[in-house]
Amino acid sequence: MGPRKKSAKVCVMDSEVAEEMTADEEKDYMNQLSHEVLCHIFRYLPLQDIMCMECLSRKLKEAVTLYLRVVRVVDLCAGRWWEYMPSGFTDSSFLTLLKKMPDVEQLYGLHPRYLERRRVRGQEAFSIPGVLEALQACPNLVGVETSHLELVESIWTYMPHVHILGKFRNRNGAFPIPPENKLKIPIGAKIQTLHLVGVNVPEIPCIPMLRHLYMKWVRLTKPQPFKDFLCISLRTFVMRNCAGPTNSLKYVPLVTGLASARNLEHLEMVRVPFLGGLIQHVVEDSWRSGGFRNLHTIVLGACKNALEVDLGYLIITAARRLHEVRIQPSLTKDGVFSALKMAELEFPQFETLHLGYVDEFLLQSRMANADLVKYGLADVVENPGIITDIGMKAVNEVFSCIKYLAIYNCPHLHNPYNWISDHSRWMRLVDINLVRCHALKLDSFGQFVELLPSLEFISLDQMFREPPKGCARVGLSAGTGIGVSSALVSNQNSNNDNDNNAPNNNANLHDNNHHHPDDSDDDNDFRPDLQAGEAQFAADALNEMEDMVQEDGELVAESGNGMPAHNREVLPVDADEEQAGPSGLQRVVKPTPIADHDSESDDEEDSLELQEVWAPKNGTRRYSEREEKTGDSGQSRETAVSGKGKTPLRKRCNNSHQTGQAKPFPLEESSCEKGCQVTSEQIKADMKAARDVSEKKKSKDVYPSCSSSSSSTAASTAGNASSPSTASQSPDFARTVTSSGSSEPSPPEVDVSRQCVCSPGGSEDSEAMEEGDAESSVCPRCCCLRPQESQRRTGRCSDEERPSTSRACVVNGADGTRSAFSFRTLPQGGSSGPAHDERTNGSGCGATGEDRRGSSQPESCDVQSNEDYPRRPLTRARSRLSHVPLISESEVAKTKPCHAMKRKRTADKSTSTSDPVIEDDHVQVLVLKSKNLVGVTMTNCGITDLVLKDCPKMMFIHATRCRVLKHLKVENAPIVNRFDYAQCKKLNMDQVLDQILRMPPERNRIIYLRPMQQVDTLTLEQKLFSGPYPYHICIIHEFSNPPNVRNKVRIRNWMDTIANINQELIKYEFFLEATRTEEDLKKYPKYPWGREIYTLEGVVDGAPYSMISDFPWLRSLRTAEPNSFARYDFEDDEESTIYAPRRKGQLSADICMETIGEEISEMRQMKRGIFQRVVAIFIHYCDVNGEPVEDDYI
């Protein structure tokens, strides 16, 4: 306030008063102060500033001399222990300085940047002998703080009475351990804290004063380095990745010495190969006398020989004060916590548990275990922790007060929901951090989060990841190598049809909710009005699938009303060239196809070359079954359970001409094919079918070929219907099959080639085809071609306009009930399925169930020429969507046969992970519902959609390198205000921004984006400023590379200032509040859309930025002169950031309003409204070329 009064004195004065003022200003007030006052002032100044005052005046020089003569504590680094002391010292100057301080007792900050080992005659330098000489010139010296290895060893040698103050921490540590870093510790050294990093030490002797010993990358050179180890005052012992003796017996003195430290609080041993069971025996001997009783932190990591009893005894002994435990993977077992549970102990202060703990150095080091062993570290190969859901339930029963839980790489954890029991409620859990738990199920995790009453923070790293391409087809568990042969695994997970069971193929996985799907078809066998989609569920239940199917994701065979709500809203995703879907997969409810015969062996192909000209890769089984059913209904059960594997038999269709209606076939034979993997039951059926193959060959004829190679290529898709070109060769009539299985003739004037014969009852298409995919428009269920205009939905939003969380495909049942199915977006080169007639106004080729049953003339689809067929086989991702063919096989048999052609081999078989397929990203929706959740952080996760269902306290979302994260849906999260999306390759930026800006304006919001694709800035700005968003909007385009965070960090300071001014004006000055209703949007259809938009540009640290905004007041505040409250201790100004309010003195809304008073009056006269809240969107363009830029701040 002083400077403010001074500025208020500015007025007209006569010359005499001005001369008096000048005389007063020229007075030297410092020289008028007494020596005592000056010495008191010097106590608050750094030594460097005090020494600079010597040359200012004689009185100040006297005061400095007097101060140095009486000073007892000197800090050469002015309290900044991490810095180096001032440079420029030599031996003589340092000696002169210390001679001026005869009474100094404690010398802090003796951190020279460089010291010579010895003096050089005739040359001024700063050397170790010179420093020792200067220290010895201080007779009262008690202690010195330093970080120099050779200097501290010299002090111990030549000045043993001097204490080493503070924390000794050498600053030249590295790995591999530099040979020049050496330190010999004498017995009884006067030091309390010793931190050694990358040092060669002969031994750790008896040091009674030592309280904290920290050793990292220390090489212990003596054969018995702990022979004399005894530190009775020790409170902290940390030994990480040290190169010590390999003989486990040589660590016995170490553990016994630690037991004698009765005040030991922190015990951390990483890669220490002590003898297994040693700690157990030492605890048994010492616990009565207080050994390990006061531990509050226990860390065991990569200790090769450590046993469960060692850890258990430590935990039990320290139960009263234990705060934190970090457990290495080999000890992360159910048995540890079961035993602790039986001990019936209480842990009143316990808060933090880290399971599967792996040291940071081992995680970040690129060295293999052999390289580490070469440098002297212990030979340890860690396997993942084997704790299961049963063990996790026991964790909370043991540690009921746990607040922070971290789990690393525990692949046998599946259902977090099962961690909760009557005795395990996780009532106090505040923070959960999951890393690489690849089998954890997403839906179960969401349910677990919902039941945690105190949870505030979630951190997910490498969770719910997508498997490599093809892993889903060969039964591999994503990225872990845990899996079984594809010949033994049922493919419930065909291509993108991943569910929660597929990755969990380990025999030792604990899950008590197994069931077989055989019980789901009882009500459907005799329902003739069953829809095709429902029939598939019933048919799938008759096939032997995986031996473990989870209850929580059970496929419901009856009407859609029986499905849980979270399954009804399963979300499709965009067509993409990469597969997403991790090991712990969310249940996606789909029409599950039945088994097909997928023959890929060369021998069988040669033998069946002439018999199978039209041989679709995925689905000829249905034809053979139905033809056999027509010829002999008694064979239906034999053909219903047929195998599929590496080289199963491919069944061929009968060519007998049927004159009457086909007999109704069982429902289990009317579904889509399943995939490419087999069960043991199906293998047995294959063997039986092989014995009868000669009989069946007699009753089967050749399938007619398609008219061209391109047709045959397209035919290798689903195989559920004949190809369009085949159908078009007999345009007389076609038969449509009702849901009961009978066929009806259609009028002969309807061209079969123009019909879509695949559509299940009323199912709508999953997503519109990409507009760029004009080269082929293929119906996914029958491969009939449709024109592009019929593919594009007229009544639906595009993917950019509408998140996948709001789209669900609905199949109308016969009784009006609804069943939810999630159909994938089709790969490029295919097309989306037939659209629901409500959505396409009749332009699609699908019909409702009632239409199909009651009408003899199904809706038709237009056809394009054959050259528009895709030039590659359509994938299983397409073929699994195929339904029952509606053309009778008798009509297929009447078509003209073409010349036999050997089918083109592709790698699309069950044992290949290099298939020539384009797979969609697996839809994985993380639904968060929590009363206390504050923030979620996701890194390298395979989640595609994030839904904030009910998070009233949520404040931030951070997503980094989430490759398939696309959408955000906010249902109820009113105060979330910070969004950070960095290097998320497939993020739908328009949809995310729209969701955030549509939230009610209860908070200012800031959005950080680092896109990995080009951004159309003009379109983006138009959408944001013209949209119905009741915020002032600021878009900042940052082009620094490598990334500069200066602007990003500073935005938060001044965006709130703008909002605070607006709120003051609206609440207390009765300023007009702006709105963005539909009427406002119609009123301002063109630029600037009712906003006052302006642009600011500049350069920060050599990188340009551009800001387009309608923030009021900002331009005036930026250009205003600094006021009396200006703070110049702040590092930023207008040249280094967009706006620096502290440099201007604009510290509050009231001060700012004084500055912009005129502009406020003008706005009031213009009756221009303002919004109460603001949104800042910061877009960093360093990654837009698709290559992520390394960034320490990310």
Swiss-Prot record:
Stretches the record annotates as Interaction with KLF7: 59-119
Chain positions found as Phosphothreonine: T592
Assembly and binders: Part of the SCF (SKP1-CUL1-F-box) E3 ubiquitin-protein ligase complex SCF(FBXO38) composed of CUL1, SKP1, RBX1 and FBXO38. Interacts with KLF7. Interacts with PDCD1/PD-1.
Motif (Nuclear export signal 3): 451-460
Subcellular location, record wording: Cytoplasm, Cytosol; Nucleus
Pfam families xrefs: F-box (PF00646)
Gene3D superfamilies assigned to the protein according to its UniProt record, in alphabetical order: 1.20.1280.50, Ribonuclease Inhibitor
Function per UniProt: Substrate recognition component of a SCF (SKP1-CUL1-F-box protein) E3 ubiquitin-protein ligase complex which mediates the ubiquitination and subsequent proteasomal degradation of PDCD1/PD-1, thereby regulating T-cells-mediated immunity. Required for anti-tumor activity of T-cells by promoting the degradation of PDCD1/PD-1; the PDCD1-mediated inhibitory pathway being exploited by tumors to attenuate anti-tumor immunity and facilitate tumor survival. May indirectly stimulate the activity of transcription factor KLF7, a regulator of neuronal differentiation, without promoting KLF7 ubiquitination.
Knockout or disruption consequences: Conditional deletion in T-cells does not affect the development, peripheral homeostasis and population of memory T-cells, but leads to faster tumor progression. Faster tumor progression is caused by higher levels of Pdcd1/PD-1 in tumor-infiltrating T-cells.
GO BP term (any one): positive regulation of T cell activation
InterPro entries in the record: F-box-like_dom_sf, F-box_dom, FBX38, LRR_dom_sf
Protein name, UniProt field: F-box only protein 38
Location of the motif Nuclear export signal 1: 194-201
Extent of motif Nuclear localization signal: 902-905
Expression (tissue specificity): Expressed at high levels in embryo (developing brain, spinal cord, branchial arms and limbs). Widely expressed at low levels in adult tissues, with highest expression in testis. Expressed in postmeiotic spermatids.
Ranges of Basic residues composition bias in the record: 896-906
Pathway recorded for this protein: Protein modification; protein ubiquitination
Ranges for region Disordered: 487-529, 577-776, 793-879, 896-915
Residue ranges, compositional bias (Polar residues): 855-867
